[in-house]
């Protein structure tokens, strides 16, 4: 059995670790709430653009934008959104399993894939997998800006325009609630048709196009894709903070259990030491 002094040192060390994990849990909870507010604030913008795009597309019968047109799929582009940091449980591992499953499904159909990566964890993981990587962005922090995403979004858009890829998807962790984050595959291009009752009622909307529907759709579609990628990244950030909060709470609880176990061992060691001292005193008295 370890000595009492050694056990006290271990208890002090675990208590220090417990303080750190408790602080990280509280910080993650605060960041998660702020990220949820950004999620709620950005969603109406992308929803409004999506409806306007659908209105214009349905009203322009003589023009079909390539971003809205299905074509034979020979190559698929995936934007993968991961975290820059760890200590968030199995969040990234579950995401990467989903990505690998999507890549395998396409490969089995004879379809090639190319990746655009967001986050250090995705970059370090997929660079060792031998997958074609077109673009990557890291270090977005807790408050990503839209301009930080322009490169990776425009890169995939150009690949789609040039016919280098025939579909574009984004894969990220969708925030369900504090205890649940779900890896999600969302199609970006070609844009899925919006199911909305008011789209059928042409009398409820009417636009005069300046200069023309093509130019307007070009601009709106790019803005919409940027907003969708931004929304996915913010969603993933909320998932990261929730997963980190849960992981740090588990670590804090485990530290508390370990302290209790060490305290019990310390008490036994202390009791044994006192018993030995008493035995020595009794033995000495008997010898006299």
Curated annotation (Swiss-Prot):
Pfam family for this entry, one: ATP-synt
Annotated CDD domains: F1-ATPase_gamma
Protein's cellular compartments: Cell inner membrane
Keywords, alphabetical: ATP synthesis, Cell inner membrane, Cell membrane, CF(1), Hydrogen ion transport, Ion transport, Membrane, Transport
GO biological process: proton motive force-driven plasma membrane ATP synthesis
Domain of life: Bacteria
InterPro entries membership: ATP_synth_F1_ATPase_gsu (IPR035968), ATP_synth_F1_gsu (IPR000131), ATP_synth_F1_gsu_CS (IPR023632)
GO molecular function terms listed in the Swiss-Prot or TrEMBL record: ATP binding; proton-transporting ATP synthase activity, rotational mechanism
Membrane topology of this protein: Peripheral membrane protein
Cellular component per GO, a single term: proton-transporting ATP synthase complex
Gene3D superfamilies on file: 3.40.1380.10, ATP synthase, gamma subunit, helix hairpin domain
Main localization (coarse): membrane
Subunit organization: F-type ATPases have 2 components, CF(1) - the catalytic core - and CF(0) - the membrane proton channel. CF(1) has five subunits: alpha(3), beta(3), gamma(1), delta(1), epsilon(1). CF(0) has three main subunits: a, b and c.
UniProt record similarity statement: Belongs to the ATPase gamma chain family.
Function: Produces ATP from ADP in the presence of a proton gradient across the membrane. The gamma chain is believed to be important in regulating ATPase activity and the flow of protons through the CF(0) complex.
Protein name per the record: ATP synthase gamma chain
Lineage, uppermost ranks: Bacteria, Pseudomonadati, Pseudomonadota, Gammaproteobacteria, Pasteurellales
